[in-house]
C-alpha cells in the first residue's frame, strides 16, 4: 500500500460577481484638474503655441511625407510580408507550409546546393 499525499492542485474558486459602478455621466475635465492646462493662454504667448509638442511633430511629419508624394504600394507590401529568399507558391497566400522531411532533403555534401521549395 502506498501513501497518497494531499493533492497540490486546487480547483479555482468561483469569484463573487461584483457589479460595475454606475455611469453617472460623461467625464468632465474639471474632475482631473491636475492634468488639464488652463483654458486662457498666458500673456505674450499666442494660443496656437500651447499645443502638445508631440502633436506638432506629427504635423511636421505629415507635411514632409505629403511633399514627397505617395509611396508605391509595393513598398508597403514588402514591409508587411518580408521576403525570405525562398518564394514558394503557397507562401504569399497565407497558407502555411509543412517543414521539409529530413530524409528527403539532400545535404550539400550529397548533391548540389538546391532550394528546399
Curated annotation (Swiss-Prot):
Out of the domains of life, which is the source? Eukaryota
Q: Where is this region: Disordered?
A: 1-117
Coiled-coil residues are none
Any one Pfam family match given in the protein's UniProt record, by short name: GAGE
Remaining remarks: This gene belongs to a multigene family expressed in a large variety of tumors whereas in normal tissues, expression is restricted to germ cells. These genes organized in clustered repeats, have a high degree of predicted sequence identity, but differ by scattered single nucleotide substitution. Their sequences contain either the antigenic peptide YYWPRPRRY or YRPRPRRY which is recognized by cytotoxic T-cells.
The family annotation for this protein states:
Belongs to the GAGE family.
**Protein name as it appears in the record:** G antigen 12J
Organism this protein belongs to:
Homo sapiens
Protein encoded by which gene: GAGE12J
Amino acid at each position: 500500500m502506498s501513501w497518497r499525499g494531499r493533492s497540490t492542485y486546487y480547483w479555482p474558486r468561483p469569484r463573487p460577481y461584483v457589479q460595475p459602478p454606475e455611469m453617472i455621466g460623461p467625464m468632465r475635465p474639471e474632475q482631473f484638474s491636475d492634468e488639464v492646462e488652463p483654458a486662457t493662454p498666458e500673456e505674450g504667448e499666442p494660443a496656437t503655441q500651447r499645443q502638445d509638442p508631440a502633436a506638432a511633430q506629427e504635423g511636421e511629419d505629415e507635411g514632409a511625407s505629403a511633399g514627397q508624394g505617395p509611396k508605391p504600394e509595393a513598398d508597403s507590401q514588402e514591409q508587411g510580408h518580408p521576403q525570405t529568399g525562398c518564394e514558394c507558391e503557397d507562401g504569399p497566400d497565407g497558407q502555411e507550409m509543412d517543414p521539409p522531411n529530413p530524409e528527403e532533403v539532400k545535404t550539400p555534401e550529397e548533391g548540389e546546393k538546391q532550394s528546399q521549395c
